């Protein structure tokens, strides 16, 4: 079926006996929903398109999608045999998997642009390609390849997934993998930044390049290794190790243990609640004036008689 030179289309592929197996969209904003009994090919062309692959029975999967150029949304409910190309633009791919074919897997390519992958699926392959892409995963044996750009893996989705909730995750960007508390392993290729979970105890290790590593909640251990890294413990009692390079360490709330390592490091505090008094205070173990280390309090309240936080002003600029 070819539909072209129209301002936009909205199409639902029915469950009837006769239906189109190849769909061509327009260069405008199209909405295409699959409800038919057979696999289809979709060529959406340009425009900000919404595409839904929502068969959830034995007829699902094995589709081909070329979303084209534009900021597209592709939602897939059946995992197995799908080849999906998001194309140019800042796209969103959602694997809201309700049914899967255990004998097959999906392959999804992000194309150019800053894409977002929300993955609640199993053992499929995801390629960010060019751009600064973000992968959200529950940790079910997937393969993630960021490609070029500065790319991020996040396991925040575990917080809402009962099978892994509260078990934490181990992420090692230098060795290109992550494992969940249940022992499931995912491959992480060409990914620079990582975010853990809100409820588990996460162990996050960076690589030789600059990384941004976030622990969120729980007792997290974060190690930057090489590069100029940003380490953010979030809430909970965290241990942060900068390694080599000029690193920024933010313990967040809780009793935190901060080790800058070699290089000019900054220990960044943004609220008085981030370090308690007495035995619950944060500990910096290796502050060295010779390395020009800094304790940054510039965003903490300088005048308690005024509401809100007022930054410090230093004599001489």
Model-derived regions: residue spans:
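Surface-exposed loop/turn motifs in large extracellular/passenger domains
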Residues: 38, 58-64, 80, 100-107, ...
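Parallel beta-helix/beta-solenoid
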Residues: 37, 60, 69, 79, ...
